[in-house]
Amino acid sequence: MKSETLTIQQIFQNQRQYRVPFYQRAYVWTQRNQWSALLEDIFEKAQSRLSGTKPTPHFLGAVVLEPQLKNSLLGVDTIHIIDGQQRLTTLQYILASIRLSLRATGLSELEGLVLTCLKNTNEATMRNKKVECFKLWPTFRDQTHFIQSLNVDNIDDLRNVFSDSFTQHGTLRKHFNHPPSLEALWFFTEAFIKWI
């Protein structure tokens, strides 16, 4: 077993996919219990950087990973997430929200920095492009909404894909059972747009 400290970019940049094994629970993190505190930490670190102060690293917690043997030249490297799937999935939603926020605020020229951490791009090396393009592959229960959420191009697209979850004025319905991926994307995207 190897222990090391990695940045988000180091975790997600290479041509690999983190898979959530079938026995793991579905995505359950929420605004009240996890997202708000994480977002405060993100903004605090960003403000430190903008003010010229070197921020202290943020410890998101330990992640236990199990690399899988590759038995073909084709296919991205696959790593099973034994512990930490809630954190890694949340990071994917945050990165997708940053991308949507950059597009919504006219800063889409910066999205390339984020896109390399969201998608595997070298399709020539993939066995199944529709699956292997994602840096993270969730449990079966979360796959449909995860794919829909990460494939949207902008906020209007998000509203269209999840039209039942929005009012006719484009706001997220209250007291509605939204897919967790939509709730995460909407929460983080709104917050990043306000911050930008």
Map each language-model feature to its residues.
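Glycine- and hydrophobic-rich flexible loops that cap the catalytic core of alpha/beta enzyme folds
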Residues: 1-196
